[in-house]
Regions:
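Aromatic- and carboxylate-lined catalytic core of secreted/periplasmic carbohydrate-active enzymes
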Residues: 17-21, 25, 30, 36, ...
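Active-site neighborhood of glycoside hydrolase catalytic domains
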Residues: 162-247
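Short, solvent-exposed loop/turn segments at the edges of extracellular beta-sandwich modules
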Residues: 82-84, 494-500
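Extended acidic/polar, glycine-enriched regions
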Residues: 52-109
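An acidic-aromatic substrate-binding cleft motif
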Residues: 88-155
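Catalytic-core region of carbohydrate-active enzymes that cleave or remodel glycosidic bonds
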Residues: 145, 205, 222-285
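Surface-exposed, flexible coil segments in extracellular/virion-facing regions
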Residues: 456-475
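Solvent-exposed loop segments of extracellular immunoglobulin-like
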Residues: 444-451
């Protein structure tokens, strides 16, 4: 009986003390216990009586509890364990005040903010505010370092991940969840089950999505996902789905890009589509230009900007009547129609981060001008800086309502038709080409962007992207249908140059 008595006495000794030094709010308190029960967990309670049920994980023969206090004050906890030596033991630790903003949450439909400060969050990965990393034990120290640095770790769960251990190790930290690196290789129902398991156990209610080969939009209807991810170098999928989904989105636009100029241009195109960037800069120069982007966007009301289509065919963002941002990828004359106010006008150089201010303000409803030179791309910034400052003084996160667009599906009103595939069947092995033929010719239709998706509805796996652009080669995933032949539903969505979204669909027989 003596060893049992010593164990209990030792446990009481530890729990009677401050198990962590005073810990700033939103920083980690890790409690290490000389226990061996892998089911050990603790219920933590803060000063405002919100509780967190935290499971332990095993390392070096001991049990570890990780808690991040969300407010200053005294936190108490009570252990539950199958080991009588630890069951019902209690302890406390102190949290001190800090300026940490909290964790990321959804706000204003397509944007993010911090949970504690309620200030906007500018998603900038992988060289800014976010770092993507596999949620593995081997990466434990790196994930802890990301948290300590005040950044967010976008955790990618391997398909064989031990989810309960991942929750215990990382669930208290500043993270987001991606339940798969590429969900398309997995069964949709299995992905949903993994996601629901995470959401049920995640005490901090972190954002959750999935990695993808193209778009995680097919998972949106399942209800668990709260932000969208893309892997879209040309940006057509996120630009079009931005008009459909009431969710924020991030795009890994830089896949395969090694050239600095191409990376910078793709970064700004992604931004103009209303999507946040989530790509690693391929060079040191590209990383510096990403920092230029962060500096510029941080000075805008980025949390209210939406794609704007009255910029003479240029890609643009706007909070109309307050701020307009136009990306001039190919230097030349630009015309922008704005609400009539007194605006400051400036040109931002995305290469070196310098700003050139126009001498005269814009007081009319139309800006017409040329960038300072034609050597490279430029960003035109038209804004009411004094008005923006006033908006910040009387802080209101959301100053306008964002409504989803209704797709025009009436064939008589759609300005294009599906010309390819012809016939009634598509071969999985050799799917052939796709093409949309314009039936109405205008500046708006000439600038149209297309997204082609396919779905075998009977199999319940939702849609997959099979092409982008007006024409090209269909790429049909081999696991799109569980058995062949199958009824294939092909859909094309087209976004014209003034922001109107159209859709057509057609059924085919999918054969081997």
């Amino acid at each position: 009986m003596k060893p049992i008595f010593l164990t209990i006495a030792f446990a009481n000794l530890i729990l009677a003390q401050q198990v962590c030094p005073p810990t700033p709010a939103w920083q980690l308190c890790e409690i290490t216990l000389p226990a061996t029960d892998p089911t050990l967990r603790a219920e933590f309670r803060g000063p405002s009586h919100r509780t967190f049920l935290i499971p332990s994980f095993t390392e070096s023969g001991q049990q570890h509890l990780r808690i991040v206090p969300t407010e200053p004050g005294t936190w108490d906890y009570r252990i539950t364990s199958a080991d009588p030596a630890w069951n019902t033991k209690e302890g406390t630790f102190s949290a001190t005040a800090s300026n940490a903003p909290g964790y990321i949450e959804i706000a204003n439909v397509h944007h993010f903010r911090y949970s504690a400060s309620k200030q906007p969050h500018l998603w900038a990965g992988d060289t800014g505010t976010h770092t993507r990393i596999l949620a593995t034990t081997a990466n434990d120290a790196s994930i802890l370092a990301i948290h300590k640095a005040g950044k967010t770790a976008d955790l990618i769960l391997p398909s064989d991940a031990n989810i309960p251990e991942a929750i215990a190790r990382f669930g208290a930290l500043n993270i987001t969840w991606q339940v798969e690196s590429e969900f398309e290789s997995q069964d949709r129902e299995e992905v949903r089950k993994r996601a629901e398991l995470i959401k049920a156990a995640d005490q901090y209610r972190h954002l959750i999505s999935s990695g993808t080969t193209a778009t995680s939009g097919p998972l949106a209807a399942d209800g668990w996902l709260n932000y969208l991810t893309y892997r879209s170098p040309n940006g057509d999928a996120p630009a079009i789905e931005h008009q459909v989904y009431q969710l924020p989105a991030v795009n890994d636009f830089g896949l395969g890009l090694t050239d600095t100029d191409q990376f910078r241009q793709a970064l700004w195109r992604t931004t103009m589509d209303g999507v946040y960037p989530a790509s690693h800069a391929p060079t040191a120069t590209a990383e510096a230009q990403m920092q230029n982007w962060i500096k510029f966007m941080s000075a805008t009301r980025h949390w209210e900007l939406e794609p704007f289509f009255d910029a003479g065919g240029r890609r643009a963002l706007a909070l109309e009547g307050v701020e307009y941002i136009v990306y001039i990828e190919q230097p030349g004359p630009v015309t922008v129609t704005v609400e009539k106010h007194n605006y400051d006008v400036a040109w931002f150089n995305p290469i070196n981060g310098e700003t050139i201010e126009e001498k005269k303000n814009l007081k009319t409803e139309t800006f017409t001008g040329d960038p300072p030179d034609t050597a490279h791309d430029w960003v035109l910034h038209i804004s009411r800086e004094g008005h923006k400052a006033g908006m910040l003084r009387s802080y209101k996160f959301e100053s306008r309502e964002i409504l989803p667009q209704e797709l025009e599906a009436n064939p008589a009103k759609v300005p294009f038709e599906i010309s390819l595939p012809a016939g009634e069947s598509i071969s999985l092995k050799n799917p052939g080409s796709f093409a949309a033929k314009l039936t109405k010719d205008s500046k708006a239709t000439q600038a149209m962007r297309f997204l082609w998706t396919a779905e075998v509805t009977a199999d319940g796996q939702s849609y997959r992207v099979v092409g982008t652009g007006r024409e090209g080669q269909l790429v049909i995933p081999p696991n799109l249908a569980k058995r062949l032949p199958a009824l294939l539903h092909l859909k094309v969505e087209g976004l014209n140059g003034v922001g109107k979204l159209y859709t057509l669909d057609r059924n085919y027989q999918l054969i081997p």
